[in-house]
From Swiss-Prot:
SUPFAM superfamilies: 1-deoxy-D-xylulose-5-phosphate reductoisomerase, C-terminal domain (SSF69055), Glyceraldehyde-3-phosphate dehydrogenase-like, C-terminal domain (SSF55347), NAD(P)-binding Rossmann-fold domains (SSF51735). Mn(2+) binds at residues 150, 152, 231. Its cofactor is Mg(2+); Mn(2+). Signal peptide: none annotated. This is 1-deoxy-D-xylulose 5-phosphate reductoisomerase. Keywords: Isoprene biosynthesis, Manganese, Metal-binding, NADP, Oxidoreductase.
Length: 396
C-alpha cells in the first residue's frame, strides 16, 4: 500500500483526494492529514481514515483537535506548526504527498516533500508561480517526481509523449515535436456579461462557477481569469515552454481540459467530465490507472464544443499574469500575493470586482525588482507585496 500525506485535507482538493482513496482502499493508506483551523472536519477525517498523524497550522486548533480525538478514542497523533508540517511532508515512511494547501502557506511543506525526493502531486499553484526555478532545480537534485494535479496541466501532461512526462520542468518540447501547448479555460461565469455591468458584480455571483465545484478564492480567480494566468505561469515552468510555445483558448464547456499541438499537424487533447477526482486519481496512480469514481463522458449528451480567443479587455488579470512572467519571479510572486489580498478584500465587500486587477497592477508596478535565489527571497517579496496590496485596498 502506498502511504499518502495530504497537505490541505480540509480543502476542496483534499476532500476530493480522500474520495479517491475511498474508491481504492486497498491501494492507499492515509499516513498524514494537514489542515489550517477546521477542527470539526479534521476530526471527522481522522475518525474515518485513522491516519498516523494529523497536523494543524494553528496551535490552538491543534489542541482542540487533540481533545476531540481523545473523546472519539482515535489514536492519531496531533502535530502543530509549520516545522512539524514540513517534517511530516518529508517523513521517511511517506511515498507521496498531495500538495493542496492554497496560497503561500503551502510553499515550505511542498518544498520539504520535493527535497525529500517524494512523489509530489502538485495542486498548490503558488509553488511554481512564486518559486518555479527553485522547485524545478530541487526536484532535479533530489529525484522527486512532480505530477501536476490542476486539470489543465494534468491534461497537458497526459497529452505529452512519455519522454516529456519523465522530464517535468526540463523537457525539450521542440526536440519531441511539440509545437504548442494549448491551455483551455471556461471563461468563468461572466464570459458574456456586458463589461459595463462588471462594477456591480457581487461575491456571490463571482463564486458561482458554471462547470467546476471549487473553493471561493479559486472561483473568483476563475471569474477574473487570474486562475488561467497563474496556470500559464505554471505551465511554462512545468513544461519548460517559451512564450511562443504557449496558447490560451476559451472553451466554455470545460470538456477538453487542454491540448498539445505537434509539428506534424496532430493535436492531442485530454477530455472528460469536469471533476477534479480524475486528475487526482491519475497522479496518485501514475503510470497506472485507478477508479476515480467519476462518470464516463457521454458523447451523445454533448451539444457542442466551442472555442473563443480570450479578450484582454474582459480579462485584464490574464494579461497582467502573462506580462509578469516576462518580468521575472519577483513580479509573479508580487502579483500572486497582491491577488490573494485583493480577492479576500472583494469577498469581504471592501472593494469592487473591477478593483481586483487595479490592486494587482499597482503592486506589480511598485515592487522593486529583486533576483529570487531562495525561499527567503520569495517570502520577503510576498510580505512586501501584501503590505502594498493592503495599502492599495485602503486607497481605493
Amino acid at each position: 500500500m502506498k502511504k499518502l500525506v495530504i497537505l490541505g485535507s480540509t480543502g476542496s482538493i483534499g476532500k476530493s483526494t480522500l474520495s479517491v482513496v475511498e474508491q481504492n482502499k486497498t491501494e492507499y493508506e492515509v499516513f498524514g492529514l494537514v489542515g489550517g483551523k477546521n477542527v470539526e472536519l479534521m476530526a471527522a477525517q481522522c475518525l474515518l481514515f485513522q491516519p498516523k498523524f494529523a497536523a494543524l497550522d494553528d496551535e490552538n486548533a491543534a489542541k482542540a483537535l487533540e481533545e476531540q480525538l481523545r473523546q472519539l478514542n482515535v489514536k492519531t497523533e496531533v502535530l502543530s506548526g509549520q516545522k512539524a508540517i514540513c517534517e511530516l511532508s518529508a517523513h521517511p515512511e511517506v511515498d507521496m504527498v498531495m500538495a493542496a494547501i492554497v496560497g503561500a502557506a503551502g510553499l515550505l511543506p511542498t518544498l520539504s516533500a520535493v527535497k525529500a525526493g517524494k512523489k509530489v502531486l502538485l495542486a498548490n499553484k503558488e509553488s511554481l508561480v512564486t518559486c518555479g526555478q527553485i522547485f524545478i532545480d530541487e526536484a532535479r537534485k533530489s529525484g522527486a517526481q512532480l505530477l501536476p494535479v490542476d486539470s489543465e496541466h494534468n491534461a497537458i501532461f497526459q497529452s505529452l509523449p512519455p519522454d516529456a512526462q519523465q522530464k517535468v520542468g526540463f523537457c525539450p518540447l521542440a526536440e519531441l515535436g511539440v509545437s504548442k501547448i494549448i491551455l483551455t479555460g471556461s471563461g468563468g461565469p461572466f464570459r458574456v456579461k456586458p463589461l459595463d455591468e462588471f462594477a456591480a458584480i457581487t461575491p456571490a455571483q463571482a463564486v458561482a462557477h458554471p462547470n467546476w465545484s471549487m473553493g471561493k478564492k479559486i472561483s473568483v480567480d476563475s471569474a477574473t481569469m487570474m486562475n488561467k494566468g497563474l496556470e500559464y505561469i505554471e505551465a511554462r515552468w512545468l513544461f519548460n515552454a517559451s512564450a511562443e510555445e504557449m496558447e490560451i483558448i476559451i472553451h466554455p464547456q470545460s470538456i477538453i481540459h487542454s491540448m498539445v499541438r505537434y509539428i506534424d499537424g496532430s493535436v492531442i487533447a485530454q477530455m472528460g467530465n469536469p471533476d477534479m477526482c480524475t486528475p487526482i486519481a491519475h497522479t496518485m496512480a501514475y503510470p497506472k490507472r485507478i477508479n476515480a469514481g467519476v462518470a464516463p463522458l457521454d458523447f451523445f449528451k454533448l451539444k457542442e464544443l466551442t472555442f473563443i480567443e480570450p479578450d484582454f479587455a474582459r480579462y485584464p488579470n490574464l494579461k497582467l499574469a502573462i506580462d509578469a512572467f516576462a518580468e521575472g519571479q519577483y513580479a509573479t510572486t508580487a502579483m500572486n500575493a497582491a491577488n490573494e489580498v485583493a480577492v479576500e478584500a472583494f469577498l469581504n465587500e471592501r472593494i469592487r470586482f473591477i478593483d481586483i486587477v487595479n490592486v494587482n497592477r499597482t503592486v506589480v508596478e511598485n515592487i522593486a525588482p529583486v533576483q529570487v535565489k531562495e525561499i527567503a527571497d520569495v517570502l520577503h517579496i510576498d510580505k512586501l507585496a501584501r503590505e502594498l496590496a493592503e495599502q492599495a485596498v485602503i486607497n481605493l
